[in-house]
Amino acid sequence: MAKFKQAGAIIVRNGKTGPRILLVTARRNPDNWIFPKGHVESGETLKAAAVREAREEAGIEGKVVGAAGRMSFEFGDNAYRVTYFVVRTTGEGKEREGRRLRWLKYKQALRRLTYEETRDLLRDAWPRIKVFAATRASGSRKKK
């Protein structure tokens, strides 16, 4: 069995009533809702790959603000280990690669995510995600 390393992004932004989480549909099965993820290119860090996947799959420019967790799965004859990061953005995103996008509250995202392993990842990371989503970008200040 071939083994592959991937990176993924749990994309968050602040909404009027709290953090919103971006889900995308899977390219191979548009009924499956997931977090953007994919291969790590040669010489690329996991964090850089997560940011690139957010851009490629969701049209999001963002910044890694923390670790979210790891998940392993098998697909066909391959084994994958995905390292997820929380990527914070202020953007809306843009549907790309034939994928749909949805900004959801935490409980809505749990219901929409297709795979139990991904729901577990979100549950485990949620306390950190709330903190990361609320943290202002370094160097930015509120106007008085």
For each of these PLM feature ranges, what is it?
Residues 7, 38, 52, 104-107:
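Structural detector for helix-capping/boundary residues
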Residues 28-33, 94-144:
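Nudix hydrolase/Nudix homology domain
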